Amino acid sequence: RGIFAPMISFNQKIKKRAKDINSYLCVGIDVNAKSLGSDNFEDLKIHSKKIIDATRDIALAFKPNFAFFERWGSEGFKWLEETVDYIGSDSIIIADAKRGDIGNTAGQYAESIFDHFGFDAVTLNPYMGEDSINPFLVHDDKGVFVLCRTSNSSAHIFQNQKLNRGQFLYEKVAEWADSLNHKNNIGLVVGATVPQELSRVRDLAPNLPILIPGVGAQGGDLEKSVYEGNKSGIGIINVSRDISFSGDCSVESIRSSAQSYVKKINEVLNV
């Protein structure tokens, strides 16, 4: 009888890749006409391949944002399929879909993202509770990143509301997500624009991967984000526009920007 190796969990997989390529950078793929300066659909598709070609060997993960593909209808969904295929199975691909439904609906979303498109992980909105998360936790090797304390300017309206025990809502989300991590495949999303909250989340969920958007165009604090995100567990720095549309938008400019981020991150981590 053959000997089968145990399945590696998603969180183990992302830590291993970070160590193997010495990178904690996630490259967001948010290709749009305004940023590129062209509303030609083929130009957008070509540019998405440029981003991947320029960063394939130095990106810990890629994060295509569904909205930028869905906006183009059926052709956009085909483009998304082609993008996942073009990235390939050696990289980690996170679906920035922010799904948040329950039951059978959530199950269909999970099948779409994991089985049809072939993503390794997905961003999820926890507002509807455990029913919106569990359908995505079926496979140990597929991960979820739960929105916890996001980088947008109005996030505090709900996320910094105090609960009965004086705990902030985002703190409750961090503890709750940590308690669901039975298969070692749950992570959190916390913005680089709120380093104090990021530090608090890391204390509450010391072992969960944290995906950290908001660096670059949103003006988040890179150094503090790297330090707080990686003082335990792994903190993954997501950069989209500042890499994808760097300089003259050539492969060389995109790669140079990505390399600069990897270098800055590794300097903070002393790796």
Task: Specify the residue positions occupied by each region the protein language model found.
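Conserved anion-binding
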Residues: N32-A33, D101-V189
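Conserved N-terminal beta1-alpha1 strand-loop-helix module at the mouth
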Residues: M7-I92, R165, E252-N266, N270
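Short, well-ordered coil/turn segments that N-cap beta-strands
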Residues: I21-L25, I58-L60, S89-S91, G118-D120, ...
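N-terminal active-site wall of soluble small-molecule enzyme domains
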Residues: A59, P64-H116, S154-A155, D178, ...
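Conserved, mostly hydrophobic/aromatic
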Residues: V27, F62, D96, V122, ...
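C-terminal helical cap(s) of enzyme catalytic domains, especially alpha/beta-barrels
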Residues: E223-I234, R241, F245-V271
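A C-terminal functional module that forms or caps the active site or interfaces directly
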Residues: L188, A192-N238, D242
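Acidic (Asp/Glu)-rich catalytic clusters
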Residues: A18-D20, I52-I58, E82-G88, P135-D140, ...
